[in-house]
């Protein structure tokens, strides 16, 4: 049986797949439930939370975006502020890889917290030698 991670970092790709009832959303729901049952922290950078917010606001409405963030809070997701340590690590990922800056924050948080990053975004293949990834598929 694989060892449980110290924590999970949720990328916006994972959260949006859950919110929009995409195929990977069911696995995200299971990861969240398993994490709560096993007292494994669920983390998300505020940068990635903002990404979820603006994408949801564009596709639906600002009210739906606010509700989505509230759902994450109710699931027990801890929003992690972008301090200098996290921002510098994100900058290091950005300097070395061709990926969005928001994705660099998710990777940096997972690396700094020794957590498993939950995503299906293929941009993260570039950093999988430095970050543990729980891959999702749609």
What does each of the following model-derived ranges do?
Residues 23, 47-48, 82-85, 105, ...:
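Short beta->alpha linker loops
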Residues 15-16, 49, 124-125:
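A generic structural signal for short hydrophobic patches within well-formed alpha-helices
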